[in-house]
């Protein structure tokens, strides 16, 4: 396999690098900074999307439509202890929100143990404030209570359609009923602030916006509509399939009347709105209105590659450093250097291209599975 990711420094080489701006020590004993670390664009680090597995039990046409994929070697996946160490380092440099992703995270057999070690860090004075997970919901009915017991705070479920026939067409699986059962199980388990993520594709499900809002309201959740994104490969993305934020608001305005935009207080990607009856929903317009300028998000693949951007073509291999003996403080140094060098504005650069070609061809993705969006939390 062609390696395009740059290994992080490990072993003796790391001793040449010192933390020069340490001002305090966290509860975990890690050196931290009094002032936030900023990248070259002035953005701080706050949100980590942590993939725990690259495999998925669906084959959604906008994400991973092919029958077979080159999976990451199982021995390369970060262990629970390795995840805990790396998470400590991320918290020490400013991460206050962590979201577990996949692939499909509920496939991983030791997911509960991962949740337990991370949830124990939430609210302990370290700075971590939130732990959430994104799932396709297929396995959720059987695992919702287990996730709650392990310490999961919030759940986001992907739900693009309420029609079983459309679900099968987009996911290539007949498990729509399991997703609905999973959503109901989340409410029964006592979760609140639940989100339903719906990728809106022109000519496919753009006629279901109000139905999805009503469904979300009935299950005590909030729907977030997502513009169809270009993730490359065999997805056959094209700009003419994008149903834009403006078009969504126009469609919903005709149905419900005046829609009020809600104030935005953080760097979350969704813009939130309120209907006349008080129902709220969100729109993530990452295709037509990229949020690169305020993006505080980075990604960690299931095998420990740290990516500064969803569209990054290279990253830093934290797994190699940890397995070579790096401590959490060593990882802190790697993160500090890496974030200060960050200048990624991937979605803005894609938007600026006059002719939108496929992000990455299938042939290149087959050579390096790290470039697949499903390995980096999509």
Swiss-Prot record:
UniProt KW keywords: 4Fe-4S, GTP-binding, Iron, Iron-sulfur, Lyase, Metal-binding, Molybdenum cofactor biosynthesis, Nucleotide-binding, S-adenosyl-L-methionine
Amino-acid positions noted as binding [4Fe-4S] cluster 1 in the UniProt annotation, renumbered to this chain: 56, 60, 63
Annotated ranges, domain Radical SAM core: 40-259
GO biological process, one term: Mo-molybdopterin cofactor biosynthetic process
Pathway annotation from the record: Cofactor biosynthesis; molybdopterin biosynthesis
Catalytic activity: GTP + AH2 + S-adenosyl-L-methionine = (8S)-3',8-cyclo-7,8-dihydroguanosine 5'-triphosphate + 5'-deoxyadenosine + L-methionine + A + H(+)
Residues holding [4Fe-4S] cluster 2: 292, 295, 309
Co-factor remark: Binds 2 [4Fe-4S] clusters. Binds 1 [4Fe-4S] cluster coordinated with 3 cysteines and an exchangeable S-adenosyl-L-methionine and 1 [4Fe-4S] cluster coordinated with 3 cysteines and the GTP-derived substrate.
Keyword Ubl conjugation assigned: no
Known role: Catalyzes the cyclization of GTP to (8S)-3',8-cyclo-7,8-dihydroguanosine 5'-triphosphate.
Family the entry assigns: Belongs to the radical SAM superfamily. MoaA family.
Official protein name in the record: GTP 3',8-cyclase 3
Organism encoding this protein: Mycobacterium bovis (strain ATCC BAA-935 / AF2122/97)
């Amino acid at each position: 396999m062609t390696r395009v990711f740059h290994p992080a420094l490990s072993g003796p080489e790391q001793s040449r690098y010192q933390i020069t701006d340490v001002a305090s020590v966290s509860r975990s004993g890690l050196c931290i900074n009094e002032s936030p670390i900023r990248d070259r664009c002035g953005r701080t680090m706050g949100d980590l999307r942590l993939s725990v597995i690259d495999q998925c039990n669906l084959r959604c046409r906008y994400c991973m439509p092919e029958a077979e994929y080159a999976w990451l070697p199982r021995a390369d996946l970060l262990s629970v202890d390795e995840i805990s160490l790396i998470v400590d380092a991320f918290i020490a440099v400013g991460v206050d929100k962590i979201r577990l992703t996949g692939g499909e995270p509920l496939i991983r057999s030791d997911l509960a143990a991962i949740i337990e070690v991370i949830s124990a860090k939430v609210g302990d004075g370290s700075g971590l404030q939130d732990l959430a997970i994104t799932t396709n919901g297929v396995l959720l009915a059987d695992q919702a209570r287990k996730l709650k017991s392990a310490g999961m705070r919030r759940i986001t479920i992907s739900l693009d359609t309420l029609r079983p026939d459309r679900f099968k067409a987009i996911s290539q699986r007949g498990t729509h009923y399991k997703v609905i059962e999973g959503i109901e199980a989340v409410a029964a388990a006592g979760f609140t602030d639940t989100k339903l993520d719906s990728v809106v594709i022109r000519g496919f499900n753009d006629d279901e916006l109000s139905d999805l809002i009503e469904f979300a309201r009935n299950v005590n959740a909030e729907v977030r509509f997502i513009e169809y994104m270009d993730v490359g490969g065999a997805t056959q993305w094209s700009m003419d399939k994008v149903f834009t934020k403006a078009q969504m608001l126009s469609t919903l305005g005709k149905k419900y009347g005046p829609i009020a935009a809600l104030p935005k207080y953080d760097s979350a990607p969704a813009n939130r709105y309120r209907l006349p009856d008080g129902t709220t929903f969100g729109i993530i317009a990452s295709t037509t209105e990229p949020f690169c300028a305020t993006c505080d998000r980075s990604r960690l693949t299931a095998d420990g590659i740290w990516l500064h951007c969803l569209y990054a073509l290279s990253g830093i291999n934290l797994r190699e450093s940890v397995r070579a003996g790096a401590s959490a403080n060593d990882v802190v140094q790697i993160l500090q250097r890496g974030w200060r060098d960050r200048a990624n504005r991937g979605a803005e650069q894609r938007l600026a291209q006059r002719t939108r070609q496929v992000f990455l061809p299938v042939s290149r993705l087959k050579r390096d599975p790290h470039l697949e969006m499903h390995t980096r939390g999509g």
